[in-house]
């Protein structure tokens, strides 16, 4: 179904108390307006006209990778005026869908229903019935059909009793919408050009006006302050959690889980409380994710356990691995099958081979570590010389004792042993033992200093 979209995103959002344009505030880690843009792209919108005003530079920087037509509304004179700024770009015979950058949860199904409901010579709008309609434009019907929308400030006492309200979302052909917009005036309580007045214009011409309801009222809730944004965040997360539970993922507490990207899960996955998923994350079968862990743009293979409070970003973890607690895997980190990293271990651009382990207090950066290696507590790969990064290569079956510093570039051959406390600056051959320590001294009869009285 061919259509183009106008997204209204020019509002300042005063009640957000922020220097950032309202629509750039994030929901599930993504700007609200980006949710709307993505929905339009998923539905195959031919053109997306983004009407902006306040914070234009910030908007264009944040959405630099989006294929949108930027339309400036220099003065905020109402929703009708905003849409009219984009009207020169409308094709006469195309459907024009009007959406809002601060209404991020509208679904593809609801939009498709609205597009399908639009009469050939008329207009379709999205309405919702609310128990408390205060503040919304009321839908005025005459013996069934919609004949007008009356804003709260212009409504009579009788009209204020109406519970069916306008969401602002509508669709009409470009030719009709341009004509109706050209006929708007600002003779109302707010002195603005209301988009809603096009409904009365359509009715006056004898055009059909169809009303469609969303699947759920949360889809059309807008954001004017941080309280409303927080409410939508929880509603969105509840929806995401429900989908995962239906797919068989065990969320220990769905109310304490945040998905801020996409998650693919195998079978029998268990996710404990306060876990955050960001970017694109893939989790295999029989995986356990411990409480408080953060996973971003990473892959976790089958039968692996991520213990509590681990942070994994841009990393790959193989099968039957154990990570954490309190482990940080940074971009480029890779654990091969059966590898183990424990508490306060950090890896960056490093590979830990099959069956190898670094269980305590270790930094492995720019390193390639073979199979069956034991990395003792307190080991550091010294990869940075103040100007450039250098690589550490450790072969198979190497034992690195506690509190060693491996000053890169350095290579350790298969089966070598590095004694505890060693500062290694030269390559080590296969099977060698290397120890660098100051001579041990014993002082007999030594007395500790006495405390002053």
Swiss-Prot record:
Tell me the residue numbers annotated for binding Mg(2+): 102, 224
Keywords, A to Z, come to: Acyltransferase, Cell shape, Cell wall biogenesis/degradation, Cytoplasm, Magnesium, Metal-binding, Multifunctional enzyme, Nucleotidyltransferase, Peptidoglycan synthesis, Repeat, Transferase
Q: Where does acetyl-CoA bind?
A: 377, 383-384, 402, 420, 437
Q: Where in the cell is it found?
A: Cytoplasm
Instruction: Give a yes or no for keyword Transport in this entry.
Output: no
Q: What is the predominant subcellular site recorded for this chain?
A: cytoplasm
Query: Which cofactor(s) are needed, names only?
Result: Mg(2+)
Q: Give the source's domain of life in one word.
A: Bacteria
Q: Which parts of this chain are annotated as the region N-acetyltransferase?
A: 248-453
Describe its partners and assembly state: Homotrimer.
Family statement = In the N-terminal section; belongs to the N-acetylglucosamine-1-phosphate uridyltransferase family.
What's the protein called, per UniProt?
Bifunctional protein GlmU
Q: Which organism is it from?
A: Vibrio cholerae serotype O1 (strain ATCC 39315 / El Tor Inaba N16961)
Gene expressing this chain:
glmU
